[in-house]
Amino acid sequence: MKEYDNELSDLVAQLNRAAPSNKATARASQSTASLDELLAFAGGRGASDVVLIVGAPAVLRVNGTLAPTSGPPLDAEDVRSLMLPLLEPSQLEELQKKRSIDLGFVRERVGRFRVNIHHQRGTLAASIRLLPTQIPSLDSLHLPATLGKLAERRQGLVLVTGPTGCGKTSTLAALIDIVNSRRAAHVVTIEDPVEYQHENRSAIIEQIEVGRDTPDFAVTLRSIMRQTPDVILVGEMRDAETMATALTAAETGHLVLSTLHTNDAVQAVARILDSFPAANQPQIRQQISLALAAVIAQQLVPGIDGVSRWPATEIMIATDGIRALIRKGDDHQLRSQISVGKADGMMTMEQSLAELVRANRIDRDTALAHCFRTEDLKRYLG
């Protein structure tokens, strides 16, 4: 490990990205394939991700399923030579200090990508996400069209939640695109990294990348509040300071869109509260009850054809009834309120899964494997 740290230190001081060695760009999972060739290979097979780990060939994720390539196992030099040329000196310093880094990069004639470079068993590893070039629509994502109404709101906090890889960023991009097509609004996004690049139409859109344009979410969000934006997108609410500022922004005339890592809509309320000291939670609960506009919890579920994946969504709209329950601390009643809120655009995850089964998009066993409350789902399926 010390030898590798010394190597990183030397690279920080001596990096010359204008003249990378042939060796650094030629070694990949398939004999002498370059990173560009590997990524083009992955894109041609419809992969969403490429995973590089020492001791295994490059692995593709296609329709949610991992598929190893036929190349030989990667060694430590393979991964280093593929990944380190992507990094600026400051990013190498961050990798050395934090042992992990996220960044976006573009390969000409290949595409746009997001990569997480990290360490495992004393060696570099990487997970590369292939980014679509087209901004998705709610329809192309197979999400309810009613979600488009959230993009028309003038203020409030809209949260998209779910596990990693469930499409949260794509959902946010679709909502921003609706704003861009319908409103003369000033939109500012804070992302780590920027994944979808929006072109100005009706709106003016600024996209700020953490690590390149700003040090972190919280600092930038405070600064943005002085720039009179109409819509703010925070890629992820990672800490109490960011959450508090986002709630304040949503209360004071801004539409704020963000994400959390929770499985369902109700957990989003608890997740925010638990980020604050107990003494502050009553005040934060009041803020949530006033600022929250909606929570969209989603997951991608394998289709009945074995190829496609379909989004199952739990949607909680902040109606007067929902706000009252949050304000009083009756979070245990929120799910019941969601289940009877179809007229307001709400549904539970089990109701969404049942709809997918009835539409012959997923089978019953798959729905049962992805539900949170088995008895509820069985009741909806009949």
Give the label of every model feature segment.
Residues 2-382:
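Short, flexible helix-loop junctions that flank or precede catalytic/ligand sites
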